[in-house]
Amino acid sequence: LTGLFLAMHYTPDVESAFASVAHICRDVNFGWLIRNLHANGASFFFICIYFHIGRGLYYGSYLYKETWNIGVVLLLLVMMTAFVGYVLPWGQMSFWGATVITNLLSAVPYVGTTLVEWIWGGFSVDNATLTRFFAFHFLFPFVILAMTILHLLFLHETGSNNPIGLNSNADKISFHPYFSYKDLLGFAILLVALASLAH
């Protein structure tokens, strides 16, 4: 939601991208807060993802191949989204990042130069690059949402982890109030931590 509000005021242009972000922070009502929540929220999202992966490794969830592989694709998609989003406020990439990626691509025999021009939209990082990065950063979350639904769909094919294979119905407790309050508490703690970073 914060991204949608930011997109209303952002300009994907190398000359005015940084100025538009400064305008969001200074002139838009609570623009500084929206930008803060967007950036720090993304960082918290990654922390949650790493916890999720760690739990999956601990409980051997990689044995559910389809669910795990979709999760890996999800992680790559989220990382790609974060990468193209990181470029947007500055209106240019760090020269180091641009050089490394450009050199990697241009090293491909025969088609290297064409690859660089195809990805950047020119010989280097320029206006075309910024415009397509903005478009990708806006579109990828919808792809991520679709993949998340697939991730859950495959998880519900097998159910979550039950290595012994015994009937565990007797041990089950209702989702509400136990798990709903547990999730609500975690969400509240995360929200307080996020809000405290927004000063």
Swiss-Prot record:
Note: Heme 1 (or BL or b562) is low-potential and absorbs at about 562 nm, and heme 2 (or BH or b566) is high-potential and absorbs at about 566 nm.
Cofactor: heme b
Transmembrane segments: 1-8, 32-53, 68-88, 133-153, 181-199
Family: Belongs to the cytochrome b family.
CDD domains: Cytochrome_b_N
Subunit structure: The cytochrome bc1 complex contains 3 respiratory subunits (MT-CYB, CYC1 and UQCRFS1), 2 core proteins (UQCRC1 and UQCRC2) and probably 6 low-molecular weight proteins.
Binding site for a ubiquinone: 156
The protein's role, per its UniProt record: Component of the ubiquinol-cytochrome c reductase complex (complex III or cytochrome b-c1 complex) that is part of the mitochondrial respiratory chain. The b-c1 complex mediates electron transfer from ubiquinol to cytochrome c. Contributes to the generation of a proton gradient across the mitochondrial membrane that is then used for ATP synthesis.
Record PANTHER family: CYTOCHROME B
Localization annotation: Mitochondrion inner membrane
Primary gene name: mt-cyb
BP terms from Gene Ontology: mitochondrial electron transport, ubiquinol to cytochrome c
Coiled-coil ranges (or none): none
Annotated heme b b562 binding sites: 38, 137
Key words of the record: Electron transport, Heme, Iron, Membrane, Metal-binding, Mitochondrion, Mitochondrion inner membrane, Respiratory chain, Transmembrane, Transmembrane helix, Transport, Ubiquinone
Membrane topology qualifier: Multi-pass membrane protein
Residues given in the record as heme b b566 binding sites: 52, 151
An MF annotation (GO) of this entry: ubiquinol-cytochrome-c reductase activity
One GO cellular component, as annotated: mitochondrial inner membrane
Note accompanying the cofactor annotation: Binds 2 heme b groups non-covalently.
Record's protein name: Cytochrome b
Keyword Repeat appears in the UniProt entry: no
Gene3D superfamilies from the UniProt entry: Cytochrome Bc1 Complex, Chain C
